Amino acid sequence: MGYNYVSLIVTILLVVITSPVVFGNDAAPIPENKGRIEQWFNTNVKQNGRGHFKTITEAINSVRAGNTRRVIIKIGPGVYKEKVTIDRSKPFITLYGHPNAMPVLTFDGTAAQYGTVDSATLIVLSDYFMAVNIILKNSAPMPDGKRKGAQALSMRISGNKAAFYNCKFYGYQDTICDDTGNHFFKDCYIEGTFDFIFGSGRSLYLGTQLNVVGDGIRVITAHAGKSAAEKSGYSFVHCKVTGTGTGIYLGRSWMSHPKVVYAYTDMSSVVNPSGWQENREAGRDKTVFYGEYKCTGTGSHKEKRVKYTQDIDDIEAKYFISLGYIQGSSWLLPPPSF
């Protein structure tokens, strides 16, 4: 499949910030009423605070190592076929696209070529990264069970304190490596087939659609927690599970201590009645933490759930449904507006 190359300007804006913090409320829970989310977010996330390039890579390369200023890279509409890495020495970078003409960053890297986690179209190693109105794709073909190393990531986020607003992620197996650090996803769309959100991150997904494609066994999360003391896990709040088939699992125990919670989430009939894939390793039914809280939809019915599903109560839920889960009030900024 060919690509239309669009020669468009990538613009850099420098925003001087004296401190990468915001003053919000870590304890305020996300409201159960979906219509009140924006009011909650705007109340609890408050902002304190040229050059022209033809590729995203050129723009990122122009940012000096050890940067201490928020750099906003405005990306024009079009398809950018690039494999982009943001080094850990370049924090405070924002990739910004127009919401009505979202740029597409795409590449076809696979595990066979690069190794699984390095196959990503976008690799972020730096802290304080932000992406707004960006489409990230891995255009490699869907794994067919025959080709070795067919996993293909759209993104790997390994930096701490990263935020994604109105972004779309397309892939099949291993779409997002939510690797390490605190992360926030809001109003995003994530598509995949198997383990398409995996890693050891500590992340809050708010108002995000999880769309599963293809037939056969499908699994959304493979959280890689390795001990009860590890401070990592995925919390999905006011999200939506959609897709095809009826074999979708909310998660599986890739490692010994996964921690995944779905709250106020709409689960369609595509979710397998058991909810979570049965553990293949002995004893993992005692070490996993799979929680569900006030979810809705045909796929949320509890009658046939695996016995180790946690039906968490109001007190337990507060831990997972506030910015405190990712310590967000100390670093989270709203998206820039132009």
Swiss-Prot record:
Record bears the keyword Signal: yes
Catalytic activity, as annotated: [(1->4)-alpha-D-galacturonosyl methyl ester](n) + n H2O = [(1->4)-alpha-D-galacturonosyl](n) + n methanol + n H(+)
Domain of life: Eukaryota
Sites marked Transition state stabilizer: Q173
Principal place of residence: secreted
Gene Ontology annotations for the cellular component aspect, listed alphabetically: extracellular region
First-level EC class: hydrolase
Position of the signal peptide: 1-24
EC nos: 3.1.1.11
UniProt-recorded name of the protein: Putative pectinesterase 63
Organism for this UniProt entry: Arabidopsis thaliana
Taxonomic lineage from the root: Eukaryota, Viridiplantae, Streptophyta, Embryophyta, Tracheophyta
